[in-house]
Curated annotation (Swiss-Prot):
Annotated EC: 1.8.-.-
Matching PROSITE patterns: THIOREDOXIN_2 (PS51352)
Record function comment: Probable thiol-disulfide oxidoreductase that may play a role in proper chloroplast development.
Keyword Acyltransferase (UniProt): no
Protein name (Swiss-Prot/TrEMBL): Thioredoxin-like protein CITRX, chloroplastic
Disruption phenotype: Yellowish coloration in the leaves.
Length: 175
């Protein structure tokens, strides 16, 4: 019995100029980078607008235009804590350079949509509010404070990246 040859012989490469030129114009017609003049007159705010069920806090500014979680100053946070609330307050201490903080921001946005009427979620940039972060004993990032509307309950503090389900459990069961 004779051994079969396992040698692979690739087909001849088609590198003739006529073959390439016949394929090139067709390829350019479907290019992702081809610029076509736009006939649409929609503004960016019309495209990115989102309908919200409840109003976000009147103070502070959004990290991005389409986010529900607002970035607040230390003074604004202190007013929220001292003021009357019907819903729990979740404060996220973060930094723009912190990788886990970016991941946590995505989870907090999902929570903000999910608990839109039942919780208030805000952010504090620790680089902008260094003294406030120090006073709140923020040692690692991200740090979350879960503050109940009931002043007799203690605040819950977490440090580091935590799963979204753990945040749900804290909001639903402990606040």
């Amino acid at each position: 019995m004779q051994a079969a040859s396992l040698a692979f012989h690739p087909p001849a490469l088609r590198t003739s100029p006529s073959y390439l030129s016949s394929k090139l114009p067709h390829h350019l017609n479907y290019s992702l980078f081809k610029h076509a003049p736009s006939t649409s007159t929609l503004s960016l705010t019309q495209v990115l607008s989102r309908n919200t069920i409840c109003k976000p806090p009147a103070v502070g500014k959004y990290v991005r235009e389409d986010y529900l979680v607002k970035k607040l100053s230390a003074k604004e946070i202190q007013e929220l804590i001292k003021g009357e609330r019907n819903v729990p307050l979740i404060i996220d201490f973060y930094a723009t350079w912190c990788g886990p903080c970016i991941l946590m921001a995505q989870e907090l946005e999902m929570l903000a949509v999910e608990y839109e009427n039942n919780a208030l979620i805000v952010k504090v940039d620790t680089d902008d509010e260094y003294e406030f972060a120090r006073d709140m004993q923020v040692r690692g990032l991200p740090t979350l404070y879960f503050i109940s509307p009931d002043s007799s309950k203690d605040a819950i503090r977490t440090e580091g990246l935590i799963p979204i389900q753990m945040m749900r459990d804290i909001i639903d069961n402990d606040l």
